[in-house]
Amino acid sequence: MKRYQMYVDGQWIDAENGKVDQVINPSTEEVLAEIQDGDQDDAERVLSVAKRAQSDWKRVPARQRAELLRKFAQEIRNNREHLAELLVSEQGKLYRVALGEVDVAASFIEYACDWARQMDGDIVQSDNVNEHIWIQKIPRGVVVAITAWNFPFALAGRKIGPALVAGNTIVVKPTSETPLATLELGYIAEKVGIPAGVLNIVTGGGASLGGALTSHRYTNMVTMTGSTPVGQQIIKASANNMAHVQLELGGKAPFIVMEDADLEQAAAAALHSRFDNCGQVCTCNERMYVHSSVYDEFMAIFMEKVQNIKVGNPMDPESDMGPKVNKRELDHMEALVAQALKEGAQLLHGGKRLTEGEFGKGFWFEPTILGNVQQSMTIVHEEAFGPILPVIKFDTFEEVIDYANDSEYGLATMICTRNMKYVHRLTHELECGEIYVNRGHGEQHQGFHNGYKLSGTGGEDGKYGFEQYLEKKTFYVNFD
């Protein structure tokens, strides 16, 4: 069993309190590694380091910062298989998905590097004679990045890239459930020569370490991917210092199948968008609405695909779905299904834990489909974040838009239709930040990953996401 330390100021150190935590393999329930369980004392130490390092890092020309980060991204690619195996063992995702996650982390960083020469300001006309107004973009300072357990490595890359290219320093706190691949970034940073204190990685509890990081006076920005309740706590904590906050939180994405949809294409997209990473993606198909005129035909196609899902060892290339990440999440799956059946839903497939044979250890749950679902049911409104899908009939476009908007979340929506009138109406009528038309979920780096309502604030990716890591400074220059 490997014992990990925290990466602070270019060194590997223990938590001040001497406490440690364990990382569990969700496929086998075996202890994988021991990590540091840091608290507020470690927050004070690492933020002091990051603040000091930022004064030098921001003076490095942006192009040079980007060149160093391209080496960092390439070294991530050089360690692709090792990092992917770590992700499988700590999170339970399929090996091929883990390989993709490593690639995405590297490409997030490479994409951010493309912005090194595009942090453009403005020259604005003044109302006064012989005066110019300059608006410059500058780094915010110290960024605290808190990442979720579902795609910990990709999320680290998503935040490290723009933060460092923009001239900030960063403190990354991965969740204690899946921190191992992220901690390996410290070794990679050492190898490529990222200056001490520019990239720091710490581990510990959300309330103790996370709370101290987000509320500290040295923290200029908090970027977090995780649950809505945690995001709400971060907003409160960061208000003490008026730090800039960027949050990507929960979701309850609807998948809409219109009467004119290509049903085979829609079924394939719906399947991938629900069971990808065991349903543990913020933009997953959480509630599926199918037009009544094509319901029977569509469900026949869709259910055949569901029945062919192979749950199994995530290292097995024949497996289609791995385990849930922990027992708490597994218990949540059981509770949601029980509540749905109590409220009148019909179990069409799955609905229980897998416990026999190879599933004797680990956190396994069947792909689950619920029919006879009404809009008012709990399963339609509470985020599952797992392999459970309620299916609801609808009759008109207006009805399904009302259903889709009937949620406290507003991250993503997927719709399958050939009618561009429907698509254009979504611009004005749908209350969410991302819309996928005739395809499953999965955003791109140059887009903008942005949630409405309780799904977040600030947004990530693309030019709008990169600008989150920059402040503006205005000069009124009189040259009389």
From Swiss-Prot:
<keyword id="KW-0520">NAD</keyword>
<comment type="function">
    <text>Involved in the degradation of 3,6-anhydro-L-galactose, which is the major monomeric sugar of red macroalgae. Catalyzes the oxidation of 3,6-anhydro-L-galactose (AHG) to form 3,6-anhydrogalactonate (AHGA).</text>
</comment>
<dbReference type="Pfam" id="PF00171">
    <property type="entry name" value="Aldedh"/>
</dbReference>
<dbReference type="GO" id="GO:0009450">
    <property type="term" value="P:gamma-aminobutyric acid catabolic process"/>
</dbReference>
<dbReference type="GO" id="GO:0005829">
    <property type="term" value="C:cytosol"/>
</dbReference>
<feature type="binding site">
    <location>
        <begin position="226"/>
        <end position="227"/>
    </location>
    <ligand>
        <name>NADP(+)</name>
    </ligand>
</feature>
<feature type="binding site">
    <location>
        <position position="383"/>
    </location>
    <ligand>
        <name>NADP(+)</name>
    </ligand>
</feature>
<feature type="active site" description="Proton acceptor">
    <location>
        <position position="248"/>
    </location>
</feature>
<dbReference type="InterPro" id="IPR015590">
    <property type="entry name" value="Aldehyde_DH_dom"/>
</dbReference>
<dbReference type="InterPro" id="IPR016162">
    <property type="entry name" value="Ald_DH_N"/>
</dbReference>
<feature type="binding site">
    <location>
        <position position="249"/>
    </location>
    <ligand>
        <name>NADP(+)</name>
    </ligand>
</feature>
<dbReference type="InterPro" id="IPR016161">
    <property type="entry name" value="Ald_DH/histidinol_DH"/>
</dbReference>
<protein>
    <recommendedName>
        <fullName>3,6-anhydro-alpha-L-galactose dehydrogenase</fullName>
        <ecNumber>1.2.1.92</ecNumber>
    </recommendedName>
</protein>
<dbReference type="InterPro" id="IPR029510">
    <property type="entry name" value="Ald_DH_CS_GLU"/>
</dbReference>
<dbReference type="InterPro" id="IPR050740">
    <property type="entry name" value="Aldehyde_DH_Superfamily"/>
</dbReference>
<comment type="similarity">
    <text>Belongs to the aldehyde dehydrogenase family.</text>
</comment>
<keyword id="KW-0521">NADP</keyword>
<keyword id="KW-0119">Carbohydrate metabolism</keyword>
<dbReference type="GO" id="GO:0004777">
    <property type="term" value="F:succinate-semialdehyde dehydrogenase (NAD+) activity"/>
</dbReference>
<dbReference type="InterPro" id="IPR016160">
    <property type="entry name" value="Ald_DH_CS_CYS"/>
</dbReference>
<dbReference type="InterPro" id="IPR016163">
    <property type="entry name" value="Ald_DH_C"/>
</dbReference>
<feature type="active site" description="Nucleophile">
    <location>
        <position position="282"/>
    </location>
</feature>
<feature type="binding site">
    <location>
        <begin position="149"/>
        <end position="150"/>
    </location>
    <ligand>
        <name>NADP(+)</name>
    </ligand>
</feature>
<feature type="binding site">
    <location>
        <begin position="173"/>
        <end position="176"/>
    </location>
    <ligand>
        <name>NADP(+)</name>
    </ligand>
</feature>
<keyword id="KW-0560">Oxidoreductase</keyword>
